[in-house]
Amino acid sequence: MAIDVNKFESMQIGLASPDKIRSWSYGEVKKPETINYRTLKPEKDGLFDERIFGPTKDYECACGKYKRIRYKGIVCDRCGVEVTSSKVRRERMGHIELAAPVTHIWYFKGIPSRMGLVLDMSPRSLEEIIYFASYVVIEPGDAPVEKKQLMTEREYRELKREYGASFKAGMGAEAIKDLLASVDLAAEADQLKRELQEATGQKRVRAVRRLDIIEAFLQSDNKPQWMVMDVIPVIPPDLRPMVQLEGGRFATSDLNDLYRRVINRNNRLKRLLDLNAPGIIVQNEKRMLQEAVDALIDNGRRGRPVAGPGNRPLKSLSHMLKGKQGRFRQNLLGKRVDYSGRSVIDVGPFLKMNQMGLPRPMAIELFRPFIMKELTTRKLAGNVKSAKRKIDKADEDVMDVLEDVIKEHPVLLNRAPTLHRLGIQAFEPVLVSGKAMRLHPLVTEAYNADFDGDQMAIHVPLSDEAQAEARLLMLAAGHILAPKDGKPIVAPSQDMVIGNYYLTTEEAGREGEGMIFSSVEEAKIAFASKVVHYHTRIGIQTSSFPEAKPFTDEQRSKIMVTSVGKLIFNEILPVDFPYINEPSEDNFKGISDQFFIEPGEDIHDYLADTAVIGAFKKGFLSDVIAEVYKRYKVTETSLLLDRMKDLGYEKSTESGLTVSMNDVTELTEKPAILEDAHKQVATVTKQFRRGLITDSERYQRVTEIWTKAKDVIQDKLIASFEPTNPIFMMQDSGARGNISNFVQLAGMRGLMAGPGGKIIELPVTANFREGLTVMEMFISTHGARKGMSDTALKTANSGYLTRRLVDVAQDVIVREWNNNADRGVAVKAIMDGTSVVEPLYDRILGRYAMKSVFNPETGDKLVSRNEMIDEDVAKAIVAAGIEEVTIRSVFTSTTEHGVSVLDYGRNLATGEEVEVGEAVGTVAAQSIGEPGTQLTMRNFHTGGVAGGNDITQGLPRVQEIVEARIPKGRAEISEVTGTVVAIEENPAERTKAVTIEGETDTRTYTLPLAARMRFAEGDDIQRGDAINEGPIDPKELLAVTDTLTTESYMLTEIQKVYRLQGIEVSDKHIEVMIRQMLRKVRVMDPGETSLLPGMLMDIADFQRANEPALFDGLVPATARPVLLGITKAALETNSFLSAASFQETTRVLTDAAIRGKNDPLVGLKENVIIGKIIPAGTGMAEYRKIKSKVVGEVVAQPEVEQEPTPDIPKLDDVAKSFEE
């Protein structure tokens, strides 16, 4: 029966009873045959039998008596096949009745063994019983043995002879089944609860585990004996297909081989039982049947895996679910889709921000059904068939229709790897010739694409809703800001930068300097007549600018001094935006009075005294974009970006920028600098030979000498560059390359690292212009090779980190506006020693204040409680000298399965308050994972300084923190608040003892002798402070302090890693991840509740479980917070679907089945898996309940020539418009 995916609320998993398996089945599979090799028809009673599984051809029985849909539902009287759609062969199951019970390997073999826990037996004993090595006592009767005792064949025979009928023992799965059926779960649970009150140590741990499993059986209505199977389900044949290859051979799914082994052994066992064969033969056959079923369910879990042809292990049912190629990750979480294509991308400078160039052949294929509909509607084709023929012939009519079909039908472009949400954006297609898709040059940054052969995939959203969503939420013009830090991600690069840089450069003494023009037009005419140059400094009557330009009245009466290029640059800015004359933030408030002269004043005198203003570099252009976005939002910004792109391309072409060998200037002082360095090295070597210094000191001094020499050359080289040198312009403007590239071209390459990462003390003194010697070339190759392998490793590591992060945070969604949390987090600037890692401004911007903030000097209120701190407020707070602000934080959010708007604050990608329904968890994971590839893989070695531990940095450090591992070289932390009373060194044992006296007790800590102390004798120390230098183990910190301290420490540490590499990631993303690591508590004392000691549970579930006890005045349970690494946290989620599709699939499913777990489908992943609309954005329950109706008639819109890019409306507004 078909289930409407969007209707059901939750999904439950459990153990299947034999009757349940029979009820699923459409018939028993009795023979191992598959397909008759001559007729290619399925064999009767075989694994592909049409009577059991349905017809192989649509609406046609096996013998051909009934054909056509009109006989639907009839069962043929000749061949017994039901006439129906052949699709049922994907859903109808069969079964095999086993001649002897067989244990399910998941429940016997898993860790811990579930059968072992229920029976209180060791896995070793179970194995001996199941595989017929020992007997087990089922009923001792009068015999002097215990129940569940193991015995040999000989002991069994003697006891059987002596005690006869009352004594009962057995072996194999049958014995296990009897034992499981005889367990009284309720009595066992009571007994264990009593035991728990006395037990300690290992005994207690075992009791807790057993109680957990037994309670699970009691609460789930699963019977323990169902872990042993009498019947095996046979999955539908189309899920284990058999196809004929050329040459008459067959390719088949491994499952068919595994099923055939089971059926063969089962049939043989039946025959042996009918023949009353000797016990030892039957036993052997039962053991083989058990092994065959084990291999079918999980091949290779026990013993050697069953291999197929070529000694390849066969893929069992478990393998079908596991891993990247398993059912979950290959077919449920990501599917191949139709209406998609892929092609090489090329640059499309002629495109608007919201357009992409679609090659005509691709467009015809992608929009085929739409074209066919349009052709028939316009009566250009008589029917669908003739329309199809026209398309195949590429008729002219098709091309005419194509233009209209693709108009306003957005398409999605994706580039792998999709590291963050900007890896998929929507565009309006524009038809282009050729076979390459054209991409707008400004979106390349977000996609991390270049045009050296990159390919991209294109997808066509089909339904109206999908098109609306693509247009409103995904259009590229709306994605100006990066979600990780809220800075513009679409900034001009390369040619566009150099063009605008060249245009806005000023040069003293250019032709026409000091001319005064009455208007911009007049200046342009002068330029066209070659009277002035772009770089010429000129005057212009300020009154000639439009009224909207923000000049003061005084400025309007004067002459403004600027350059011709800047006049042209300012024309692309919005009309009421301040005139930009210098690359500074202050210019955004309004142009400075220093650039104006009185009408009668001599402009030449002014210019003689005034220095040349620098050109607009890449960073400043980015600032302009951010400022325009802040003031005018999306539409105006995307139009500005296009204008800036066009201007940049045009002027970089005009500039005629070239690079030649002569631009790489030689440094005349270089030989002298090198000579000096060689002399210093010789001196150091002499000192070493005389034994004045050690080898490591010599090595260190030599490397220092060469580093210094390279720095001197670098400084002199920069000073010697002409400002008009094209190479210098490229670097200075930020278009391409940095200073070290040019030092290597014209200065010296310097010291290189060897294969082990150690610096080779022979420097590469040559540069690329002179050319390297063979020796130098080989020294250089080490670094190049290491760089390549590092990058490859880094990409894999970073991708896996992102996957784990997404998995742990995927159900964090903004669920409400305010949860009335009663505490916030006090934040101050993050420091590393004396340097600021992240300033207070960055930490409070776009967050909500927990309590009002007042200016300490004047007493003025700067921001109220629950009010957002915007740029102006943040600046005011910093200016007022306030160092600490209490803000609403994700850490203190009380919203279940998510956060509230006030906790999260501003959505960095839009610059607006975040909306209910935003999937902030996934965005957070992407924001932390995406820059992962830029982090280093290396651990820095502190050049042989004694006591300096190697510090883990970069990607390994981030992993160490989020996996909550014990860090390398960790520091000891104080467990008490008090004073350091003594530090005693013990050189013999290479340790030192630090004694701290607290208010109530005194603690002594033993540290390595080389440890660098953070406290001296007599210093005060707080609990949780690190005593010596080094990273703290967050689990230890949590045990000594509270959750908030631990969370803040982890946040600070992660920020240090990213900011050190110059990567800005907003605090809130890291907060989301860390909160997910701390959402569980472990029950310490169950009090008078139904909880079990040692249980891991969500904080919200724990509070709910405690409510009845508190209500009835009973003793509530107590628990302590637990810090889980992200992998563990992702596996401990309440959704078994999400956990199973992440890692350890069989373990997760085994556990979920025994507990009869119910998946409430609150996260994104579980809904994707079952194909339900995800509960984020418009898929949230409150948006889904909205009904829509059309009021009045729909009026056709008049056609507009070139409409600007639409503003991106909010989700709430979209929902409201549906509502209305």
Swiss-Prot record:
Root EC class: transferase
GO terms for MF: DNA binding; DNA-directed RNA polymerase activity; magnesium ion binding; zinc ion binding
Chain sites annotated for binding Zn(2+): C61, C63, C76, C79
One biological process term in Gene Ontology: DNA-templated transcription
Binding of Mg(2+), residues: D450, D452, D454
UniProt GO cellular component terms: DNA-directed RNA polymerase complex
Keywords noted in UniProt: DNA-directed RNA polymerase, Magnesium, Metal-binding, Nucleotidyltransferase, Transcription, Transferase, Zinc
Biased composition regions of type Basic and acidic residues, renumbered to the chain: 1209-1220
Record note on cofactor: Binds 1 Mg(2+) ion per subunit.
Name the record gives this protein: DNA-directed RNA polymerase subunit beta'
Gene (UniProt): rpoC
